[in-house]
Curated annotation (Swiss-Prot):
Keyword Acetylation: no
Domain of life assignment: Eukaryota
GO MF: nucleotide binding; oxidoreductase activity, acting on NAD(P)H
Binding residue positions for substrate: 136-143, 265-269
Family in the record: Belongs to the zinc-containing alcohol dehydrogenase family.
Annotated CDD domains: enoyl_reductase_like
Its job: Trans-enoyl reductase; part of the gene cluster that mediates the biosynthesis of azaterrilone A and other azaphilones, a class of fungal metabolites characterized by a highly oxygenated pyrano-quinone bicyclic core and exhibiting a broad range of bioactivities. The first step of the pathway begins with the non-reducing polyketide synthase tazA that assembles one acetyl-CoA starter unit, five malonyl-CoA units, and catalyzes a series of Claisen condensations, methylation, PT-mediated cyclization, and finally releases the first hexaketide precursor through the R-domain.
Keyword NADP included in the entry's annotation: yes
This enzyme's EC code(s): 1.-.-.-
Entry protein name: Trans-enoyl reductase tazE
Pathway membership, UniProt: Secondary metabolite biosynthesis
Length: 303
């Protein structure tokens, strides 16, 4: 471990990122210092860079949340439990946002700190590149349900006839959204490009539709009515999903109160629908470390 390391530094709002040197930090009591081998890019990374959303309180900044690498050093309070010792392969949710913008956290650097609760072992059968896509994608997919009031221990049965629409199901977040929706017991209607339909079905979707089809709204509505299920819940995973989602819910929810989790940042003047709650899906770190990391561990261990 060197005294300094390379980092992709954001010097000011709007960027651009520049490679520079940073002092390699010592981990705090509850931190894990990780030698980063791979990172994943997420839409929130360019939101932070270009728009300061989530807020960036300190510049120069280091952004990025998803990291995979090797444990370099443990904080003094990190003993036992699920976090392995130095030299072990791990994945981590290392966002600086949840650490008041501290640039010692943030995935886009060679050595990054992460809270111990947000670090889990990386199975030997997964590469660093494969492991890096897990943290934020899984957490975002799971947080969507609790954001709209669906506990993660929900288990609908076929008799409940509860359905959900996932728009953008072949993305990293969307693929985990499909799998978690099936675990909750939903009948899952999903959209994706035709080349991804078989994959999305294997993940658990009951029906998959081409989002570019000019008749996609009517086709989903017809399928829901034919199947005799109740569709008044949705997760908009990608930009541009909200209006067609609301068009579908307008025809399927009846008099029921509908709920939509929206993972991209909501535009200021976004479309609305009567008797429908539309909520920006934003994970809080308290929720992450208390209720979701165990779910992430189980998801990774199954790979």
């Amino acid at each position: 471990m060197t005294a300094e390391h390379d980092a992709a530094i954001l010097p000011k709002p709007g960027g651009p990122l520049a490679v520079g040197k940073r002092a390699t930090p010592e981990p705090g009591p509850n931190d894990v210092l990780i030698e980063v081998k791979a990172v994943a890019l997420n839409p929130c990374d360019y939101y932070q860079r270009d728009y300061g959303m989530p807020p960036v309180p300190i510049y120069p900044a280091v952004i990025g949340g998803d990291a995979a690498g090797v444990v370099a050093k443990l904080g003094s309070s990190v003993t036992g439990g699920p976090v392995p010792g130095p030299g072990s392969r791990v994945i981590a949710f290392a966002s600086s946002f949840y650490q008041n913008g501290s640039p010692d956290h943030g995935a886009f650097q060679k050595y990054a700190l992460a809270q111990s609760e947000a670090v889990i072992p990386l199975p030997d059968n997964l590469s660093f590149e494969e492991g890096a896509v897990f943290p934020l994608a899984v957490l975002t997919a799971l947080t969507a349900w609790t954001t709209i009031g669906i506990p993660l221990d929900t288990r609908y049965t076929p008799a409940d006839k509860q359905a959900v629409l996932i728009w953008g199901a072949s993305s990293s977040v969307g693929s985990f959204a499909v799998q978690s929706a099936k675990t909750l017991g939903f009948t899952v209607y999903a959209t994706a490009s035709p080349k991804h339909h078989e994959l999305v079905k294997k993940l658990g979707a009951d029906a998959v539709f081409d989002y570019k089809d000019s008749d996609v709204v009517s086709k989903i509505v017809d399928a829901v009515k034919k199947d005799g299920v109740y569709l008044h819940t949705a997760h908009c995973v990608v930009d541009g999903a909200l209006q067609p989602t609301l068009d579908i819910l307008k025809e399927t929810k009846g008099d029921a109160f509908a709920k939509v989790a929206h993972s991209p940042v909501l535009p200021e003047c976004h479309p609305t629908l009567d008797n429908t709650q539309i909520t920006f899906n934003f994970p809080s770190m308290d929720e992450v470390v208390r209720t979701r990391i165990s779910k992430l561990r189980r998801a990774v261990s199954r790979e």
